[in-house]
């Protein structure tokens, strides 16, 4: 048992999906996993272990933002021996060519957070995905006929920005979307020499608000990224 996770060692698989929303973790467990068992309910951050196509996998919510995912991901890696972590979550498009319900595979994550500069104040440390996972996920998504974009994202500390034009300017530099967790996850993966990838569904188009989705849709209907995430986990065995 760790500080924030009530599981025993062995209760959690060495590969895991990490949605931000704990109810999305429950949805994945109930709709994709067989024989799923809940291993955590502390702070309402639900976690489950079951099997997917005969492979043992886990899924757990992380909450919103880099401090929250950093707590859970670190404990999963250090205390429970997790080796492969895939974030499945939502993002807002800032690229005019990226639309709602399409997938973004986060090849790299820029950030406006100081979470990494706390360790390296003198320079920028690039946050990158594991290429093997990225390659597998891309080909799985394409084979399934999903519209998929590969590129950088911005991991932001701020959801309601007072200067959205600064974020939108990044879209002109090839940044696909804004989210709130990938940079911290990639940094932890680099520290502990494990594999990590972010797979995002576009839930909001900051260039066209008419494309936005409801809270219920975000929780239960973005199944493409869930399928790609699970298939990537088992293909990585």
UniProtKB/Swiss-Prot annotation:
Gene3D superfamilies: Nucleoside phosphorylase domain (3.40.50.1580)
Top EC class for this record: transferase
Annotated positions binding a purine D-ribonucleoside: 4, 179-181, 203-204
Molecular-function annotations in GO: purine-nucleoside phosphorylase activity
Function: Catalyzes the reversible phosphorolytic breakdown of the N-glycosidic bond in the beta-(deoxy)ribonucleoside molecules, with the formation of the corresponding free purine bases and pentose-1-phosphate.
HAMAP family: Pur_nucleosid_phosp
Oligomer and partners: Homohexamer; trimer of homodimers.
Name assigned to this protein: Purine nucleoside phosphorylase DeoD-type
């Amino acid at each position: 048992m760790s500080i924030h996770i009530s599981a025993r060692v062995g209760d959690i698989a060495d590969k895991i999906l990490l949605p931000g929303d704990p109810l999305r973790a429950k949805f994945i467990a109930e709709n994709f996993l067989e024989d799923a068992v809940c291993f955590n309910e502390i702070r309402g951050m639900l976690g489950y272990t079951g099997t997917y196509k005969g492979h043992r996998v886990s899924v757990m919510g992380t909450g919103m933002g880099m401090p929250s995912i950093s707590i859970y991901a670190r404990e999963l890696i250090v205390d429970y021996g997790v080796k492969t972590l895939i974030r499945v979550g939502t993002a807002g498009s800032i690229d005019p060519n990226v639309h709602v319900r399409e997938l973004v595979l986060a090849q790299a994550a820029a950030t406006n957070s100081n979470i990494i500069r706390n360790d390296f104040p003198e320079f920028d440390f690039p946050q990158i995905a594991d290429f093997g996972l990225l390659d597998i996920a891309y080909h799985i998504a394409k084979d399934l006929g999903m519209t998929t974009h590969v590129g950088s994202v911005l991991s932001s500390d701020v959801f309601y920005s007072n200067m959205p034009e600064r974020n939108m300017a990044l879209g002109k530099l090839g940044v696909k979307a804004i989210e709130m967790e990938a940079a911290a996850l990639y940094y932890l993966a680099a520290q502990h020499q494990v594999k990590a990838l972010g797979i995002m569904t576009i839930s909001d188009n900051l260039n066209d608000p008419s494309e936005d989705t409801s809270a219920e849709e975000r929780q239960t209907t973005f199944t493409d990224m869930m399928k790609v995430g699970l298939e990537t986990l088992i293909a990585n065995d």
